[in-house]
Each structure stands twice: as structure tokens, then as C-alpha cells.
Amino acid sequence: MTQTAGTVLLETQILQNMGRADDAARVMRAGVKVFDTDPILRASLARLYISQDKFDDALEQYAILIAQDAENWEAVYAKALVHLEIEEYGEAESLFQRLIDSGERVDESRYYLATSFERQGQLERAIDNYRLVSIGTNNFLGAQQQATRLSIALGAVDAAHDWLQRVSRGQPRLEVLFINMEAQLLQQAGLPAKAKQLLDRSLNRYPGEVDLLFARVIYFDSIKDLAGSEADLRSIIAIKPDDARALNHLGYMLADQTTRYEEALTLLESAIALNPGDPATTDSLAWAQYKLGRYEDALQNIRRAFAVFPDPEVASHMGEILWMMGRRDEALAVWQRALEGAPDDPLVTEAMQRLQTQASEDESE
């Protein structure tokens, strides 16, 4: 068969699929020597080098592509991303700016130019560039989130809010999305009171807006205000009786933090009927069954949840259920495996310490 750039690419792809990356690179390098001016083949070699963390080799290939065609904007963009990846910020910024000046990949370049500034601690320049990313583009929401987070970190909370309001004016769905995002960022920044004020004001403007109610539930959860969380969750369920997320959240909260276990079970059975197979809801259902003393049912469901989502919280629950069934060696094995993946996880360590302490006290009586 006559060799072409296409056959080189095909052979390389086959070798990669077989896990023979080094052989694929060898074939590709040989092909590039033969088909020196084929941009697709050389760009493929550069991407192969990137997959092998051979960034200098990738940069060399992109440099050749740009030398062959100064307006190969995909090569310019890819080269800029590699420089950013290996923290060669000056080179990356120069190339991103070149793309912007040429009207090519402008919004992506703005986003990554801002990322470069952020990584170097030039936060105000980062904010300015994040805010220049155009609405409706792939990076728009991420850019606004980063700009808002950095503004809050700099203490410019009101300015961040005003910017989001200005950008979303006349677009209620976008405004609600931004309010939710801003509230989360305020909480993460240690400003829960401001988050609560924002949500209260916004719910006065958009009463019954489910996403904002749920955001306020997260606030109430953070300050352990059970009554506040329950009130907003019940408001959500009244508006959307089939909201499995709210049913699960309320059911788990009642099972975990109250003795209203039957009520919790009813809510969780409704949630699982709406969202069968969801591991988080299955875990919650198992927890309510455990609290009601239905250990076998609880174990069956917790195993099902853990098989799909082996999260430390699910592991802590499964261990506790096994422990209370008298299967302590199995419980310890579950906890130990969880701690191997998440050392010192507070949920797992709390369950272990609480139950082991209780067992020691029972034995000493």
C-alpha cells in the first residue's frame, strides 16, 4: 500500500489504541520527515507529545507549523496553551495577545490570558480579562465565576455584585444563575451573612425561585439551622412536588438530625421512586432504614449505593450499619479502605471513634 499522510495517521491511531504510544510516536516522527509540510500530521505529532508530557517536543512541532504558516491560528493557540501548562507565562501571554489582536479565538484567549495573570498573582488584570469574555461563549460562565471569586477575595464585594447585575440585566434566568453563584462564592469566602442577605433580597424579587431557595437551604445547613432548611425545602416541594433533590435532602436531614424517621422514610421513598438508582438517594434511604432498625434492608441499599459511588460518607454509613449488625470486622475493613483513599476523612473517623468508644464503655460496665 502506498504510504500517505493519511495512512501514517491511521497506523499511529491503531498503535495508540493498542497502548503502544512509543511506537506510535516513532511512526509519526518518520511520517513527518516524509510529509514535512502536512500540517495535520505535524499537529497530530505535537498532540501525541503532549499526551506523553513531552512539552518541549510539542513546542518544537508547533513552532515549525507557525514558521510554515504564520496564520496557522490553531497552532498558535495550541502553542500558547502548552506554554501556559508549563508555566512559561510570558510566551503564553504573547501568543494569546497575538490571537486577540488578529481576531482569532478571542474569547478563549481572553480566558486563558486571565488565567495566566491569576496564576502569577496579578488579580486585577485577571479580573479585567475574565470580564472581557463574551456572553454566550463556552468560557463565559467560568470567566464570570473566576472574576467574581477574585473580586470577593480582594474585598470588592459590592463591585462584584454590581458587575454581575449589569451583565445579566434583562435576562432573569442568567441573573438567578449569577445570584446563586455569588451566594456560593460569598459562603466559600467566609461571608455567610452577606450570602444570606443577597438570597433574602433576591427571593423578595423572585419569590418561589427554586434554585434560590435551595441556595438558602445550603446557607441554613452551614449554620445548622434545621428549621430554616426545612422551611425552604418544604417550600420547594410545595412548588415542585417531584423535586427529587429536595425530597432527598429533607428526608436525609430528618433521618440524620431528628428522630422523625418514619417521615424521613416516606420522603426518601418518594425521592427514590422519582430517581431510581441514584446512589445519593439510595444512601439516604438506607440511612433512614438503619435508624428505624431495618438493618437488612439498610445494608442491601447501602451496598447498592457504595457499588456505584464509593464515597467516604457512604463508607461511613455502611461501616456503621455493619457494626450495629455485629459484623465489626467487616465494618473496620470498610472504614480502613475508605481511609486509604481519603486519610483522616472526618465522617469515617467520627463513626469509627464513636462506635469503638461506645463499645469500650459497654464492655466496661
Named regions from a protein language model:
Residues M1-T2, V34-F35, Q68-D69, D101-G103, ...:
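Structural marker of alpha-solenoid helical repeat scaffolds
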Residues Q13, R47, L81, T115, ...:
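Residue-level recognition of tetratricopeptide repeat
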Residues N17, S51-Q52, E85-I86, R119, ...:
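Register position in tetratricopeptide repeats
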